[in-house]
Amino acid sequence: STVSPSLGENSLSAMVLAGLIAYALIVALMTLLYRLPGFLACIALAGQVAATLAFVSGYFPVFESFTLTLPGIAGIILAIGMGVDANVITAERIKEELNNGKSLDGALKSGFARGLTPIIDGNVTIVIVAIVLMGAFGPSDGLFAKALHFVFFAFGPSTAGTIYAFGYTLLTGVLLNFVFGVFATRVMIRGAASIKSLRNPW
């Protein structure tokens, strides 16, 4: 499941191209369906992806870096999906409130409030799964392995493997989703709504 040097060299450009195409399609679809909030959500999504890659690559010295495996890439993709989902929920709630006749400011307030609970529920569930995976398949002296020792002791020592990379990238991406998909998106939307010339494209 580890990407070999030859495979990595040959497929890197293809992976980057596929990622850019997928992102362009997401931007087009989100903008078409949700207009300005959808476009702003895609900016936050790009920040989430960049921050996730920075954490994985060891750009921040306090966090460990590791070789990116196929399960690790899968974790990043799933976290991106969670980010898109969070932004869709928020944008859809705002759209519903506007269709019900509320003012823009009222729709934003109600939409943010209605969208927060399902976003938190979904992300907390994924965080729990990621922590369990990191505890079960990470180093035996790792933080989560020690914290969950009372759960895993009956199954023998934890087994280090590539699933740990999946859990790590998934946990990192979902936590960053709270920062970018919830907080940053809402700050940008509120900021755009305060600009008179941008109050129409909603």
Residue ranges and their predicted role:
Residues E9-L68, F137-S140:
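Interfacial segments of transmembrane alpha-helices in multi-pass membrane proteins
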Residues G58-I73, T90-L98, M188:
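A cytosolic-side transmembrane-helix exit/cap motif
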Residues F39-P61, I73-I80, A147-V179:
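Small-residue-enriched core segments of transmembrane alpha-helices in multipass membrane transport
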Residues S1-S4:
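A cross-kingdom feature of multi-pass membrane systems that activates on extracytoplasmic/periplasmic
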Residues A14, A18, A22, I26, ...:
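Small-residue faces within membrane-embedded alpha-helices
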Residues E96-W202:
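Hydrophobic alpha-helical transmembrane segments of membrane transport and translocation systems
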Residues L7, I26, F55, V88, ...:
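Residue-level signature of catalytic and energy-coupling elements of molecular machines
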